[in-house]
């Protein structure tokens, strides 16, 4: 059984992408001139790969995330305030909001794109029992 998750994302400008994720309050584990690993949690990392490196792994080309959504990456947090803080930091770091906040009683979430157009959501699940 797998115990860790590594999500690989292509980026056009690695230094700009590193600055964006640093702006979200995230840190890195391992960096090279063509890749950097963003620590999401103890068991999850997002590997930022330059388009050239990503293409060397991809079986059928690199998708332009600004032209279509290849995935929605969801970051789970504990509170509504943390959802707002993360989404606000993303916008301050140069990302763009996606849609409007969703609040349906059992979850609260806000979406944003990073500098390469990858779609992210900050999500808090709300216990209906309080």
Give short role names for the model-derived ranges.
Residues 1-16, 24, 70-75, 126-130:
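N-terminal beta-strand motif that seeds the catalytic metal site of vicinal oxygen chelate
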Residues 2, 41-43, 66-70:
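Short connector loops at helix/strand junctions that flank enzyme active sites
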Residues 8-55:
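Core segments of cupin and vicinal oxygen chelate
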Residues 23, 27-28, 32, 65, ...:
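Charge-dense, helix-prone N-terminal extensions
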Residues 35, 45, 74, 109-111:
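Short hydrophobic/aromatic beta-strand element in the GNAT-like acyltransferase core
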Residues 57-63:
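Short beta-strand/turn micro-motifs at beta-sheet edges
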Residues 67-99:
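Mid-chain, well-packed structural core segment of small domains
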Residues 87-130:
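Vicinal oxygen chelate
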């Amino acid at each position: 059984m797998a115990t860790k998750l590594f999500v690989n994302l292509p980026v056009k400008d690695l230094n700009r992408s590193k600055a964006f994720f640093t702006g979200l309050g995230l840190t890195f584990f391992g960096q090279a001139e063509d890749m950097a690993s963003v620590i999401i949690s103890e068991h999850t990392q997002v590997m930022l790969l330059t388009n050239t490196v990503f293409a060397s792994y991809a079986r059928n080309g690199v998708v332009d995330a600004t032209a279509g959504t290849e995935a929605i990456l969801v970051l789970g947090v504990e509170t509504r305030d943390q959802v707002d803080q993360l989404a606000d930091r993303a916008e301050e770091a140069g990302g763009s909001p996606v849609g409007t906040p969703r609040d349906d009683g059992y979850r609260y979430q806000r979406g944003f794109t990073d500098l390469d157009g990858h779609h992210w959501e900050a999500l808090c699940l709300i216990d209906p029992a309080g």
